[in-house]
Regions:
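Glycine-rich phosphate/pyrophosphate-binding loops
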Residues: 108-109, 122-145, 375
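Low-complexity, highly charged intrinsically disordered N-terminal segments
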Residues: 18-79, 278, 284-285, 463-466, ...
C-alpha cells in the first residue's frame, strides 16, 4: 500500500513548529529542558531502572481492575483483552497511556496515531523482557467543549475542505452526557451523499453504524473496533470516580499549592525563553457538576465557592463533604487529568503530542504534591498520508516534500501567475506578423493596383488568423493556468488543510473509504515510533 516513508525534521517545518517552541526543543534540544521532565525518552533501556517509581500495591491494582475490566470486556471479550486486563494485577506490569477527547467518528487522524504509538511502544518495551507493558487509551468523555468534537472534516470532490456537523446541541454538558439521538444517522446520510461510492463504502458504514447511543459510546466502540487486534485497553474517567476520591481530596486541600508550583515552573521556563503552553486562572482545579453542566468554582470570602457568574454557590465544608459522598459531581481540569491517570495506573510512559509535551513541562512540581513521579513523556508519531493523486501534482510542478508540508507553495503559485502576466511571446509574434503584412501591402501597392487587389483577400485572411492564433494561445494558457492553480490548491488542501497538519483536520474513515480496512494495520507496519521526525507515507 505504501511505497516509502520520507522523514522530515520538525525544525524544517517552522510554520507548524516554531523554533522557540517547547515541543521542538524537547525533540531536538532535550538537554535544555531535561530539568522540567522526569525521564529522557531517548533511552528506553534506562526506563527499567525507574519502574519501581510507577508501581502500585496489590489492593490498588485490584481496585483498578474491578473498575475497568467489565467495561472493556463489553466492547471486546477476546482472550487477549482478558489477558491484558488481568496482567494489570501483576506486580511487574506497567502501562503506556495516551488519550484524547471523544471526537465524532474518532475525530482527527492524530487520535488514532496516539493509540498506534502507545500500542507499538508497549510492544517494543515488552520485547525487552524486563516487565509487562499494557497500552491504555484514556477516552476523555468528561470534556465539555462540544464545538471541538461535533464535526467530521474531509476533502470533497471539488478539492475543498468540507465540514459536516452533528445536528445536536451540547448545551455545556460533558460529552459523556450527550445523546446522539438521530444526529449520527443524519450525519451518516450526509456523508454517504458526499463521499464517493467505493469498494469499501459498505464496510465503512457498517462499522460506523455499530456505534450509536452516547457520543462517548460511539467513540469507544469505534476505537475498540479499529484496534481489536491490538488489545488496547480503553478507560473513561467516570469509571474511576470512586477511586479518585483520595486524589480529589488532596487536590482540594492543596489547590493553592498547585497554583504556586505551576507559577514557579512557568516562571522558570519563561526565564530561559519559552512561552508556556498551559494557562490557568485562580479557579479550583476540580470542576463541579451543576444542572448537568461542568462549573468552575472560585473561592469567595474564605468560606464559600461560587461560579464565575455568581449563579451558584456552595460552602467550603459542604464541598469538602461532597468530594467523599458524591464523587460523580466532580471532574478534572487539564492540570489534574494526568495526575489522576498516573496515580491510579502503574503508568511508566505517557504518549503525547506537541500540546501535551509542552504542558507536561509545567507539571513536574505538581506531581510531587501528590507524591508521584511524572512518567516518561514519549512523543506520538506524526504522519502525513500522501496519496497518488497528490504525488502526480507534486511531480508536475517539481515541489519538494518540505515545501508542501510547510505550506510554502504561495511563492511558486504566484510565480505561475506572474509568468502568465509577463508572457509577451504571442503578442510579439502577432505584432511582428502584422508589421510584415503591412510591409507586404506597401510593396504590393508599389507594383500596381492589380498586384495589391490580388493579395488583399489573403492578407486580410492572414491578419484574421494571426488574431485568432493570439486569442487561442492566450485563452489556452489562461485555462491551463487556472487548472494549475486549482491543482496546487487541491494539493494544499489535501496535505495541509486549512494551513494545518493533515493529521489535525481529516478523519480516518474518509481515507478508509478509499483504501479499505487494511489501511490502519498498513500504517502501523510503516511508521517508525523511534524516529522523532514528521513522517510522510507515500501510497504505491
Amino acid at each position: 500500500m505504501f511505497s516509502q516513508n520520507v522523514k522530515i525534521p520538525y525544525s524544517h517545518i517552522p510554520s507548524f513548529y516554531p523554533q522557540d517552541s517547547i515541543f521542538l526543543n524537547y525533540l531536538e534540544s532535550f538537554e535544555q529542558l531535561k530539568g522540567f521532565y522526569e525521564l529522557d525518552y531517548h533511552d528506553l533501556n534506562k526506563l527499567s531502572e525507574s519502574l519501581g517509581d510507577y508501581s502500585l500495591p496489590a489492593n490498588e491494582r485490584e481496585g483498578l481492575y474491578q473498575a475497568i475490566a467489565p467495561y472493556n470486556l463489553k466492547f471486546n471479550s477476546s482472550q487477549r483483552v482478558k489477558a491484558n486486563l488481568e496482567a494489570l494485577l501483576e506486580d511487574n506490569c506497567y502501562t503506556v497511556c495516551t488519550g484524547q477527547q471523544c471526537g465524532t467518528l474518532t475525530g482527527p487522524l492524530y487520535t488514532l496515531y496516539k493509540a498506534m504509538t502507545a500500542i507499538l511502544l508497549a510492544d517494543l518495551l515488552n520485547q525487552k523482557g524486563t516487565a509487562r507493558f499494557v497500552p491504555v487509551f484514556w477516552a476523555a468523555s468528561e470534556d465539555h467543549d462540544f464545538a471541538e468534537v461535533n464535526h467530521v472534516n474531509f476533502l470533497n470532490q471539488y478539492g475543498d475542505v468540507e465540514h459536516l456537523f452533528l445536528d445536536i446541541e451540547g448545551n455545556g454538558r460533558s460529552i459523556l452526557d450527550i445523546d446522539l439521538g438521530n444526529g449520527l444517522s443524519q450525519l451518516f446520510n450526509d456523508l454517504k451523499a458526499k463521499w464517493p461510492k467505493t469498494d469499501f463504502t459498505d464496510q465503512v458504514f457498517s462499522l460506523l453504524q455499530g456505534g450509536e447511543g452516547k457520543l462517548s459510546d460511539s467513540f469507544v466502540h469505534l476505537m475498540s473496533s479499529l484496534f481489536k487486534d491490538y488489545v488496547l485497553v480503553i478507560v473513561e474517567p467516570y469509571l474511576l470516580r470512586e477511586l479518585s476520591i483520595p486524589i480529589n481530596q488532596i487536590a482540594f486541600e492543596k489547590d493553592i499549592d498547585i497554583h504556586k508550583e505551576l507559577q514557579q515552573t512557568t516562571d522558570n521556563l519563561s526565564k530561559i525563553g519559552y512561552t508556556p503552553a498551559l494557562y490557568w486562572d485562580e479557579g479550583m482545579n476540580l470542576f463541579y457538576y451543576h444542572n448537568q453542566a461542568r462549573v468552575k468554582l472560585y473561592k469567595e470570602n474564605g468560606d464559600r465557592f461560587t461560579s464565575k457568574n455568581k449563579d451558584f454557590s456552595i460552602s467550603v465544608d459542604e464541598l469538602r463533604d461532597q468530594i467523599v459522598r458524591s464523587p460523580e459531581l466532580f471532574s478534572h481540569n487539564v492540570i489534574l487529568r494526568p495526575i489522576i491517570q498516573d496515580t491510579l495506573f502503574p503508568n511508566a510512559v505517557t504518549v503525547g503530542g506537541p500540546g501535551e509535551i509542552s504542558y507536561f513541562g509545567q507539571l513536574k512540581g505538581v506531581y510531587k504534591l501528590f507524591q508521584r513521579k511524572m512518567p516518561m513523556i514519549y512523543p506520538r508519531v506524526s504522519l502525513t498520508l500522501f496519496e497518488k493523486k497528490f504525488q502526480k501534482i507534486q511531480k508536475r510542478f517539481h515541489f519538494s516534500i518540505e515545501e508542501i508540508i510547510d505550506h510554502d507553495l504561495e511563492a511558486k503559485s504566484q510565480a505561475m501567475v506572474d509568468d502568465f502576466e509577463k508572457d509577451q511571446f504571442v503578442t510579439d509574434f502577432a505584432d511582428t506578423m502584422k508589421k510584415e503584412l503591412e510591409r507586404l501591402t506597401e510593396e504590393a501597392e508599389k507594383k500596381g493596383k492589380a498586384v495589391i487587389d490580388s493579395l488583399k483577400p489573403s492578407i486580410r485572411k492572414i491578419d484574421f488568423e494571426v488574431d485568432k492564433i493570439k486569442d487561442k494561445y492566450l485563452k489556452k494558457v489562461e485555462e491551463t493556468l487556472g487548472i494549475s492553480k486549482n491543482q496546487v490548491e487541491r494539493l494544499k488542501n489535501g496535505i495541509t488543510p486549512q494551513l494545518k497538519p493533515q493529521e489535525r483536520i481529516f478523519n480516518y474513515f474518509y481515507f478508509m473509504n478509499f483504501h479499505g480496512p487494511s489501511l490502519l494495520p498498513e500504517i502501523m507496519k510503516q511508521v517508525d515510533i523511534t524516529d522523532f521526525t514528521h513522517q510522510v507515507l507515500f501510497y504505491e
